[in-house]
UniProtKB/Swiss-Prot annotation:
It is found in: Cell membrane. It comes from the Bacteria. This is Uncharacterized lipoprotein MG439 homolog 4. One of its GO terms (cellular component) is plasma membrane. Residues 1-19 form the signal peptide. A lipid is attached at C20 (N-palmitoyl cysteine). It is a lipid-anchor. Belongs to the MG439/MG440 family. A lipid is attached at C20 (S-diacylglycerol cysteine). Keywords: Cell membrane, Lipoprotein, Membrane, Palmitate, Signal.
Length: 279
């Protein structure tokens, strides 16, 4: 009955409003409270209802609502280890969609997740090959929110990579290129044995959007598209433990652009992460 009342388009009764406010306050008070609520009311757990409840919550208490959303993002990445563990296909499909994969998780270290084709037109796949990601771990996730104009989210992903024949040739090619400012060191010893293994640190920072992008509003909670768009500028910083990769990041005119990049006015869909935390 509570779900039916909530989905009535025109709320004419003060009793109905009271019931909805009670549901909303439980869901937005904390992620654990939302999990307990939907565990006890499984019939109400669907994307449209979750979006409507969160939209109502944003209009009544935006700080609690956004903090609950960010907690869901953190929980799904760090506690559920979405990037590290093998995917539960059914759960992932229910949250992210039938045609999505790990490359669609935000953030992640991949050609798509790093926006490589936007920085390196026609070279995105080659840059991704250089890193040859074997494993990535979300090792840090911090956030603070005051308003759509004042917030910051920092996500630290540690990556383990391995130089293989393909990535070795790509690195050599970049190092031999004139854009590397005369650096053409391609000694085999730099790419074999333990030296073929390396780590990298990627820091993803999310701050209020610039460039004319609209900030978060109640219209960001969209039941038509089944999305909760969180507008932000995204900054990506990277460093690695591999001498030759660092050489590229420091000296190669193309690759060094990857060391620190900013993308203005991006929309991060937070619904899949919050919804994943509820299943």
């Amino acid at each position: 009955m509570k779900l039916k009342l909530y989905l009535i388009p025109l709320l004419a009764s003060g009793i109905i409003l009271s019931a909805c406010s009670s549901t909303t306050s439980q869901v937005i008070s904390s992620l654990s409270s939302a999990q307990k609520y939907f565990e006890a009311n499984k019939g109400e757990l669907n994307k449209n209802n979750v979006i409507n409840i969160l939209k109502d919550g944003y209009n009544s208490d935006p700080n609690k609502t956004v903090n609950a959303l960010l907690a869901g993002w953190k929980y799904t990445l760090m506690d559920q280890k979405l990037l590290e563990n093998n995917l539960d296909p059914s759960r992932f499909k229910n949250t992210f969609g039938p045609n999505k994969n790990k490359d669609d998780v935000t953030p992640n270290i991949s050609e798509k997740g790093l926006f490589l084709n936007e920085t390196f037109t026609g070279l995105g796949s080659q840059i991704a090959e250089v890193f040859n990601v074997q494993k990535q771990i979300v090792s840090g996730f911090s956030y603070s929110w005051t308003s759509p104009k004042s917030f910051k989210v920092n996500i630290h992903i540690k990556m383990e990579g391995m130089i293989n024949e393909k990535s070795k040739e790509t690195i050599k090619s970049f190092l031999s290129n004139k854009d590397s400012n005369g650096s053409n060191s391609v000694e085999e010893s730099e790419y074999t044995g333990d030296k073929a293994k390396f780590t990298a640190d990627f820091i993803f920072s999310y701050t209020p959007p610039t460039g004319g992008t609209r900030s978060l509003t109640d219209k960001s909670f969209d039941v038509i598209t089944n999305m909760i768009n969180f507008p932000a500028d995204v900054k990506i910083d990277v460093n690695t433990s591999h001498n030759k990769l660092n050489e590229l990041l420091e000296k190669n005119d193309q690759v060094k652009r990857m060391k620190s990049r900013t993308f203005n006015g991006r929309n991060i869909d937070l619904l899949p992460f919050f919804y994943y935390a509820l299943l």
